[in-house]
């Protein structure tokens, strides 16, 4: 099926490089005809994003710092001026002090807790509120979460709390905007080698563990996530909102490692 996103215009937030999950999503959308705008934070990231945007025939790049609400407003104003409307938004933004992702969650500082929540969670609500004003004919919103929102994951700490709040936000925003034909969903992806993932200690070991213990016995790719995002952002999912869609090779359904892994652990 081709042309699923023909005539659709959307904003992609969170591309850092060619390994970003947001980039995998952007490629899938562009391949189906979507016209894309990209945000970036700072000149260094802007230099990385510009050639990627060009690969999908986009010259619409906008600086954005989600900690500065004026910056968010400027992005929405620029989209309104150029396009007049918006069909979808992809929010792939998260941050926490990596030094506080190690050790005890209880040692999280007040400052890092607040900043993590604003960037990783509340920014989606602020963007959704403004984007909705450009979706007079309906639209879709998508954010990214992780299994650490539901279960304790090593070296994730306050990010797990932020992702749990983000998932709750998805449900409340879906309820807020459903009557206006605006759908809101999230993808919970398994661990992927990304710039953000590099901030998590022992990320390589976590990737290996999922590969060995998920039902599909493999990790996921940005292309896997991109395909699911295409479904959630297109009319194929027109009856779906408020959902957390797992793309993790089925790891979320497991409660124990494989028997092989248990035997190895027992032998140790």
UniProtKB/Swiss-Prot annotation:
Its main location: membrane. CDD domains: ENR_SDR. It is an enzyme of class 1 (oxidoreductase). The record marks 204 as: Involved in acyl-ACP binding. Its EC number is 1.3.1.9. It comes from the Bacteria. GO terms for biological process: fatty acid biosynthetic process. GO terms for molecular function: enoyl-[acyl-carrier-protein] reductase (NADH) activity. Keywords: Cell inner membrane, Cell membrane, Fatty acid biosynthesis, Fatty acid metabolism, Lipid biosynthesis, Lipid metabolism, Membrane, NAD, Oxidoreductase. Belongs to the short-chain dehydrogenases/reductases (SDR) family. FabI subfamily. This is Enoyl-[acyl-carrier-protein] reductase [NADH] 2. It comes from Rhizobium meliloti (strain 1021) (Ensifer meliloti).
């Amino acid at each position: 099926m081709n042309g699923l996103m023909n005539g659709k215009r959307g904003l992609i937030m969170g591309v850092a490089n060619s390994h970003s999950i947001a980039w995998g999503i952007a490629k899938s959308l562009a391949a189906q005809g979507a016209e894309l705008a990209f945000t970036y934070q700072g000149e260094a990231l802007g230099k990385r994003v510009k050639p990627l945007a060009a690969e999908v025939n986009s010259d619409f790049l906008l600086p954005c710092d989600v900690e500065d609400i004026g910056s968010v407003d400027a992005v929405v104003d620029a989209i309104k001026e150029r396009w007049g409307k918006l069909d979808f938004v992809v929010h792939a933004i998260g941050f926490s002090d990596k030094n506080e992702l190690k050790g005890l969650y209880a040692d999280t500082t007040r400052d890092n807790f607040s900043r993590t929540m604003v960037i990783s969670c509340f920014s989606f609500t602020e963007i959704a509120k403004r984007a909705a004003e450009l979706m007079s004919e309906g639209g879709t919103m998508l954010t990214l979460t992780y299994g650490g929102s539901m279960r304790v994951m090593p070296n994730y700490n306050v990010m797990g709390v932020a992702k749990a709040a983000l998932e709750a936000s998805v449900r409340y925003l879906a309820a807020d905007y459903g009557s206006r034909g605006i759908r809101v969903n999230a993808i919970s992806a398994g661990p992927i080698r990304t710039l953000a993932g590099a901030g998590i200690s022992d990320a390589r070991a976590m990737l290996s563990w999922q590969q060995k213990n998920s039902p599909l016995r493999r990790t996921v790719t940005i292309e896997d996530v991109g395909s699911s995002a295409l479904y959630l952002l297109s009319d194929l999912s027109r009856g779906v909102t408020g959902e957390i869609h797992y793309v993790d090779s089925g790891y979320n359904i497991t409660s124990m490692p494989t028997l092989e892994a248990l035997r190895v652990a027992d032998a140790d």
